[in-house]
Amino acid sequence: MKSLPRLLKNAGLVILLIVMVVAGSLGYVVRSPMPQTAGSIKAPGLQNAVDVYRNPWGVPHIYASSSHDLFFAQGYTHAQDRFWQMEFWRRIGSGRLSEVFGNTTLSTDRFVRTQGWARVAAEEEKMLDDQTRFELQAYADGVNAYLATRHNLGLEFTLLGAQGVKIDPEPWTILNTLTWAKAMSWDLSGNMAGELNRVLLIQKVGAQAEQELHPPYPGDHPVIVPSPAIGLNVADALAQVQALDDLTGGGFEGIGSNNWVISGKLTATGKPLLANDPHLGIQMPSIWYEVGLHCRALSDVCPYDVTGFSFAGAPGVIIGHNNRIAWGVTNLGPDVQDLYIEHLNPDNLKQYEVNGAWVEAKVVTEIITVRGQVKPDPDHPETTKGIYKKDTNTTTLALNVRLTRHGPIIDEINKQARTLSGSVNGVDIPTPAALALRWTALEPGFTFRSVLKLDRAQNYDQFRDALRDWTVPSQNFVYADVDGNIAYQTPGNIPIRANGNGQLPVPGWSDDYEWTGYIPFDELPRAFNPPQGYIATANNAIVGPDYPYLISLDWDKGYRARRIVNMIEAAKGRKLTVDDIKAIQGDDSNLSAQEVMPFLAAVSFDDPALKSGLEYLKKWDFQQTLDSGPAALYNLFWVRLIGDTFYDELGNDDRLWPGPGGDTMLAVRNLLEQPDNHWWDNVSTADRVETRDYILRQAFSEGYADARSLLGASPDSWAWGRLHTATFRNATLGRSGIALVEALFNRGPVAASGGPAIVNATGYRISKPSDESSDARTFEVASVPSMRMIVDFSDFDNSLTIHTTGQSGHAFNPHYNDMIEPWRTIEYHAMLWSPAAVEANQKTHLTLEP
């Protein structure tokens, strides 16, 4: 989040904290929000008593007699541990951050309000079936029961209050849960930024060069289910996308996941093993909250017995297992967002063209309340002119949103009147024009009904029936059950296009590029008990070229998938165990480096130090472990190779820079086979034409110098974990710019193994060194395996899991950061299941009483 640091740059807050430390009151302030986890508590609204057992990791297992009480208690427990996180995310989802953070988040609120996440969620609420509504309301009632009894909800509330930002939390509602889901859908199903970046790249280097930077999925990587010039000005729209991504932790190539399921035919126990590790932006606290939801006796009144991972703010379990089935989820990466170029009426900007006729856009007015006075923005005069009230220190703004048949116009009002020139797909762009967004998540859906049906499902047919309601975000589901079956299913609304492939903005003034429907559920990719005995997904292509529908052209390039499959295949001839699955989840192999090294190894050096450095690197086992010196040297070389190859053409616009992951790895692999390709030439040098070997030599020389500068002269002191570190930052106050405040909330840096496009997917962003100084280079982890889960069907109590930080969102709670160390060293805790195991491992026992 780039804009929030300005919020707390206030000397008064620093002075307050110092006084609190000196006075000894800081301990009380940080302890007072800690929840009661033992004994008994009256919770009005419950029908019967509920037992909450927490294990040594703070994971609650909830036992209730009705689904009402079960979800009531889940809401209560989420609020105990994570209410600040819930408050922050509901403000993101509803576009209400500026009520707290003022000008710094206004552009993001405008963007979310323009899309209308809350408007769509309100439509979804009207469509809820009785059971789903009942259970969502029970959850909300549990949250509110906790709010009614607590005054100190979190240290964040206290420190913001010291800044004069008093937050009186509103009651939790079903709508808050539904808007929260829109924020997650944005993280997991957006390719709008890809369209906009593609436009910028084509404008900069041309269509052919753009294709070389983003090559198609390679034919030698696994498939899950075998079988022009543009004159658009998209910079403003892309800035809005990136600002929202900064808040949610998404929007770059590290977002993905691994999952796989192995038939009992290949395991030592004869029962299936299922594994999952979703990759999301690094954050504090963890996005996941582990929980067990158990009906004391399964019945129509209480049909749940499930454990796994939930989101604080939503009922149920998103990933996990119940008494009969287990499921894991990875991001499908479908193309479900399209940008349409709308032709506006120059005499009436509220009208747009449809097949030769002017049509009135529907205008919706969104009222945004902003803390403080809004700073005038000459680029956005209509959305920064408001009414300021001195007594409340707030400004009220009116945002008029125009809705086309495709969706909201996402440009600001003055931008809409500007001329977009040129052509798209060979069609001249009329003037004036604007961009409208069509996205499946902006249409009402039934995903929460799907989640709760999934938690209740008892077999493969019920599993598939639950996923029929899973509208967004489209995901890869792997499945196993107690009968020994394994399966795969793609769910979700994936559009069928009359024309086009979703890669670039398309004309919206005719029907030529309309969505004609969605791929029917029964025609979405699936597999059941495949002959190879396993199914693995890692955001790679799920279908081959013969599949009749377009799902995406933006697959992960398959390095992780290839390694997972190779490791499973390598074990054939012996039976796989849980230890094998742990080894796969923690694998640090860099397959791309194996492709690059033969070319680098063939380059000669005159300098004895560089010769020695290259010999050192040649002995590397390609594992990016914490203590690997060669891994450190290779990654320093790798980012230099990317910069030396591409930055001269792409310039200083970091939005265009290739990342260090799969797309760039495949692009470089292809270019290495073309020693005289134009990308190797440095266009800023007039006296020579560089070739592949020249750039390899230059990049290694620079990377070797970086290693000596950053890690010391002796390779004996080099280690990947010294460069590649993870810092878990609180999404708001952890980015305050005040060291004392950040120390309260943030944890790290800690050394991390793995890297981009590696199974242990700890991705980093490339930062271009200022003035080419190696000291500015960073490999800070930006995306992580946000949790790891292994389900053992021979005995559910043998299942294992971990997530990134801890169960608690309260700084200084013992469970705020107690999972960081085992997470980074690929260790696990037991994913307890049976009542006997839960009670035997209980650390605390709380009874919630009506």
Protein language model features and the residues they cover:
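Charged, long alpha-helical assembly modules
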Residues: 637-721
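Terminal end segments
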Residues: 550, 554-570, 574-610, 696-850
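N-terminal Sec-pathway targeting helices
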Residues: 1-20
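Hydrophobic alpha-helical segments
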Residues: 406-427, 433, 469-571, 623-626, ...
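Substrate-recognition/specificity elements adjacent to catalytic centers across diverse enzyme folds
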Residues: 10, 23-284, 298, 307-308, ...
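Second-shell loop/turn segments in exported
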Residues: 70-73, 120-133, 438, 448-454, ...
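Stable alpha-helical elements in mature extracytoplasmic
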Residues: 93, 117, 132-142, 284, ...
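Glycine- and hydrophobic-rich flexible loops that cap the catalytic core of alpha/beta enzyme folds
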Residues: 295-309, 314-316, 320-325, 329-512
